């Protein structure tokens, strides 16, 4: 596509957003997302419908050129990734670019709840998620660094882009992904161990862990207590 084509697509998306604008919902978001500017006020169901249309056409090209101008622009990017069809490695590569944009609970939770690749490829997506545990034995790249005995500050850790995120939303992303897709017989013990070791985040990370533990208790009360 030419750049003018992307501009046309972005104009169409922006037009759709304003057609679905709900001022009262915008006020609700503004109250519950402190510090988040440029909110249009579009409900999640409407954003999902826009994202599905994009995902069905050319999700990769859209994400390469998608703007970050408003809250809804960023939410749509996460939803498009959730609905994307294609090679898993490509989807995860784009997800690695997207996850550092998470800076509030609405972007985080809407993305996590629609990322169906986690249901289809749990083992691979688990490893992907664990990169965002940072300097933790749950992080496969961190384990490799420790096993190789690389001195601190040398060699680097191939952990994607988690260093660019606040601990709060990096860990909330992990917690909500675990809550949505991994509270099951195969992963419950790993989930509970991960929740126990997510103490570095702030309010939103702890809130995500609380959601994860609540889901764990509902499904596996004896293990969770």
Predicted regions and their residues:
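Alpha-helical scaffold domains
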Residues: 1-225
